Every structure is written in C-alpha cells, then in structure tokens.
C-alpha cells in the first residue's frame, strides 16, 4: 500500500525562489520572501508566475510530463480514433486494445518530454563530475573569471575599454583533452534531447485535442 501511495503521489514544480547563498542578511531574506509571496499570488490568480515565464522551457518540460502521468493514472476512457472506423459497436477486446494503446501513447509522450529536460534526462555525461572538479580547481587557483591569467596587455585594455577579459579552464593545455571529451558527450546528449523534444511535440500535435477526460 505504501508503494502504491508513493507511485500515485503528485510531483510538484515549486514556484518558490530558494536560498542560493550560504548566508543571507535580513534584507536579502525579506526580499526573497516578498518575491515568493508575489509568485504564489500570481500562480493562484493567473495560473503562472514570473519565474515560470523566465524558465518557460523548464516549466513545460517539468509540468507537462507530470500532467500526462496523472491523466494516464486517473483517466476513464480513450479517444475513439483508436478504434476501427468500421467498428460502430466495439466489443470488450477492442475497447481493451484502445485503452492499452492510449495508455502507451500518454506514457511515451511523458517519457519524451521528461528525457528532453536536462534535469530529468537519463542520459548523463560520464565526464561531468571530472570536469566539475577541474573547473573548481581552476576557480580556486585563478579566480572565478580566470583573472589571475590576464596579461598586462589585457589588464590595460580592460581599463581602457571598461570590459573584463574572461579566461576559462578549457584554455589550459592540460585540460584540453578532457574538455574535448566532455563537449563531445554534451553534443550527443543535446542531439538526443532534441530528438526526444521532436518526438514529444509530434505526439502532442497529433493528440492535443484528446488530452481531457
């Protein structure tokens, strides 16, 4: 019974802005609370808030799969388009086939959108942890913007143009091989996520008028 409750539990997509730094002074904390109250009000009043607009892709790829799963779990029927057009009085077997196919379509649609989301995609970069460690070591040694690698000419030019030259961990020769492997894997993941997006959108285009119960 406990396993069933966990399976049927609705997944949430919070509109609240979380604490992002280790220390917040009272003014910063109060400002975050006030923004969160505004986001909650907007969600209740309009159905979406400013944070949803700022991350509309993430909102869509998180909310839609959850709604599809919930529809699939609680639905009471399926589209008549899944029945044989010549079959005006479908028997029990035909209804079971249609119901099973509709469940498969909803599950596939949810799966495609969930895989298209970089936060929930099951395809992971095997070099991600290693590259993160290299990046942190770079920041600690050369600064967040790699400012300790700037040449005298760059410093003078930055002052003259009022700009900041940024140096990255990928510029160091000892990191180049790992960076190439990391970016190659990211290209594969990006292509996979784009394919999943296209497949999910094609299913949504075909069945969007049937997403009700």
What are these regions, as identified by a protein language model?
Residues 2-207:
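Long, non-globular targeting/processing and low-complexity regions
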């Amino acid at each position: 019974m406990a396993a069933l409750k966990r399976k049927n539990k609705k997944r949430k997509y919070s509109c609240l802005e979380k604490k992002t730094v280790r220390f917040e002074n009272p003014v910063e904390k109060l400002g975050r609370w006030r923004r969160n109250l505004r986001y909650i009000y907007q969600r209740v009043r309009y159905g979406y808030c400013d944070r949803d607009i700022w991350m509309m892709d993430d909102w869509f790829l998180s909310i839609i799969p959850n709604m599809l799963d919930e529809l699939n779990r609680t639905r009471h029927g399926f589209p008549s388009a899944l029945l044989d057009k010549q079959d005006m009085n479908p028997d029990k077997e035909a209804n079971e086939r249609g119901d099973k196919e509709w469940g498969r379509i909803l599950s596939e649609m949810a799966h495609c959108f969930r895989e298209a989301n970089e936060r929930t995609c099951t395809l992971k970069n095997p070099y991600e942890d290693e590259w993160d460690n290299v990046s942190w070591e770079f920041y600690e040694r050369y600064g967040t913007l790699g400012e300790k690698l700037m040449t005298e000419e760059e410093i003078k030019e930055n002052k003259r143009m009022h700009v900041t030259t940024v140096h990255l961990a990928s510029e160091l020769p000892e990191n180049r091989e790992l960076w190439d492997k990391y970016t190659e894997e990211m290209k594969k993941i990006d292509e996979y996520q784009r394919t999943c997006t296209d497949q999910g959108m094609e299913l949504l285009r075909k069945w969007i008028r049937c997403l009700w119960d």
